[in-house]
Amino acid sequence: MSKLNYKVETDPNKTARAMGRSLRISRKHTIEICREISGMKLDKAIAYLNRVIELKQVVPFKRHGKDVPHKKGKYGWTAGRFPQKASTQILSVLENAKKNAEYKGMNTEKLRIKHISSNKGFTIKRHMPRAFGRASPKNQETVHVQVILEEFY
């Protein structure tokens, strides 16, 4: 695999980073979750994702919400979903970044998400046998997620 660089250059003494590579989750769901939790305090973002996993909090789909139905509750947008699989994977990346910050000696109660983004990963190419000796592609898209945390005062 090639080396992936972070999109944002930061001071390594003041920030903690983590990256999830080749995650088998939906890129559209990941984009919507990253947009929603960007800039949040870390504890608040972890609680938000836990509520999404428990089907108590809706993630508004602002970019990829053309045919997405309304959900009950106040969340500030008309279209929304509960992307549980993507929330679980992003939650594990956030907790990894939190542990990296703790290892660096940063105060984990005063961390906020400075940068979070999702990029297209590689495609796992497979095929499905069909009738008369043919085969149809059955590809699996993957996603890379980057998180940078910083202390706020």
UniProtKB/Swiss-Prot annotation:
InterPro entries: Ribosomal_uL22, Ribosomal_uL22_CS, Ribosomal_uL22_euk/arc, Ribosomal_uL22_sf. Keywords: Ribonucleoprotein, Ribosomal protein, RNA-binding, rRNA-binding. It comes from the Archaea. The keyword Disulfide bond does not apply. PANTHER family: 60S RIBOSOMAL PROTEIN L17. Part of the 50S ribosomal subunit. This is Large ribosomal subunit protein uL22. The lineage of its organism: Archaea, Methanobacteriati, Methanobacteriota, Methanomada group, Methanococci.
